[in-house]
Curated annotation (Swiss-Prot):
Pathway: Isoprenoid biosynthesis; isopentenyl diphosphate biosynthesis via DXP pathway; isopentenyl diphosphate from 1-deoxy-D-xylulose 5-phosphate: step 3/6. ATP binds at P102, V103, A104, A105, G106, I107, G108, G109, G110, S111, A112. InterPro entries: GHMP_kinase_C_dom (IPR013750), GHMP_kinase_C_sf (IPR036554), GHMP_kinase_N_dom (IPR006204), IspE (IPR004424), Ribosomal_Su5_D2-typ_SF (IPR020568), Ribsml_uS5_D2-typ_fold_subgr (IPR014721). One of its GO terms (biological process) is isopentenyl diphosphate biosynthetic process, methylerythritol 4-phosphate pathway. Pfam families: GHMP_kinases_C, GHMP_kinases_N. HAMAP family: IspE. Catalyzes the phosphorylation of the position 2 hydroxy group of 4-diphosphocytidyl-2C-methyl-D-erythritol. It comes from Bradyrhizobium sp. (strain ORS 278). The gene is ispE. The active site is at K17, D144. This is 4-diphosphocytidyl-2-C-methyl-D-erythritol kinase. Its EC number is 2.7.1.148. NCBIfam families: ispE, PRK14608.1. Keywords: ATP-binding, Isoprene biosynthesis, Kinase, Nucleotide-binding, Transferase. Transmembrane segments: none annotated.
Length: 300
């Protein structure tokens, strides 16, 4: 939660969401996919500001503003409009989004921005983030928005509505996006599940992993995470093969403990045993691939 230099303005971060694991249980009769995921949030973020204004507007700035395209259907505005429908008399305003996270990247940038908008409107209007109306609007805005509202490490199940907090240690990491957008719908289409299909067996559903408790080490978490993959990685590789090149670069880096894709791609991440290893690996990969978006930091 941040203040802004603009008089009367409020500011929030839209932190990148990273799926440490992602299991597709199956596809429901309504076409949505049931998922199980361990989610963490990175220390890189978009910045969203809300300033007093009689009209609801959105202006984009920052190095990746052009990637946002037409803002009329941006999730920030969608979330604000839906909350205004749900909460009579809601005070809105002028949003300014400083866009630094890649779009269509598997790190929930648009969802994080929408969640930041909901937090800003909640602050402006004295709403609790636990308000059922806000929670319903978050899910209606997008499947990843509910988890981005608190932006805390958790397990996420269902279509994104069931969240359970996790005591995740701070994980040194490198995140890479090859600056190639990947549409989520294309990856699920490549996965090829029809409504009613299951990707996992009943025994797999019953044998849900027990995640480490508070105080567990990075090594304990890496060992647990290594038991569950990202089911969208194989179909995403078919849609955009450069993901394989990114994963190879991460897996070849010194000190890497675990590397995989986040969400539906194309962003991939690696976990390291210490901050120094992550920074050295990130710098080396950025030097070898200046065309890629590379961030060395932490997940928590």
């Amino acid at each position: 939660m941040l203040a802004s230099t603009v008089t009367g303005a409020l500011q929030e971060q839209g932190r990148a969401k990273v799926n440490l694991t992602l299991r597709v249980v199956g596809r429901r009769a309504d076409g949505y996919h049931d998922l199980e995921s361990v989610v963490a949030f990175a220390d890189c973020a978009d910045q969203l500001t809300l300033a007093p204004s009689p009209e609801l507007t959105l202006t984009t700035t920052g190095p990746l503003a052009d990637a946002c395209g037409d803002t009329s259907d941006n999730l920030v505005l969608k979330a604000a409009r839906l909350l205004a429908e749900a909460v009579p008399g809601l005070t809105l305003g002028a949003f300014t989004l400083e866009k630094v996270l890649p779009v269509a990247a598997g790190i929930g940038g648009g969802s994080a921005d929408a969640a930041a908008a909901l937090r800003l409107l909640a602050r402006l209007n004295g709403l609790s983030l636990d308000d059922p109306r806000l929670q319903a609007v978050a899910l209606k805005t997008g499947a990843d928005v509910p988890v981005c509202v608190p932006s805390r490490a958790c397990t996420m199940t269902g279509v994104g509505e069931n969240l359970q907090p996790l005591a995740l240690p701070v994980l040194p990491c490198v995140m890479i996006n090859p600056r190639v957008p990947v549409a989520t719908k294309d990856v699920f289409q490549a996965l090829g599940l029809k409504p009613g299909d299951l990707l996992v067996g009943v025994s797999d559903v019953l044998a849900a992993p027990a995640w480490p408790k508070a105080g567990a080490s990075i090594g304990d978490w890496v060992a647990a995470l290594d038991q569950v993959k990202n089911d969208l990685e194989p179909p995403a590789l078919k849609v955009q093969p450069i993901i394989g090149t990114v994963l190879d670069a991460l897996r070849a880096s010194n000190g890497v403990l675990l590397a995989r894709m986040s969400g539906s791609g194309a962003t991939c991440f690696a976990i390291y045993g210490g901050d120094a290893d992550a920074k050295i690996a990130g710098a080396a990969i950025a030097a070898a691939h200046p065309e890629w978006w590379v961030h060395a930091g932490t997940l928590s």
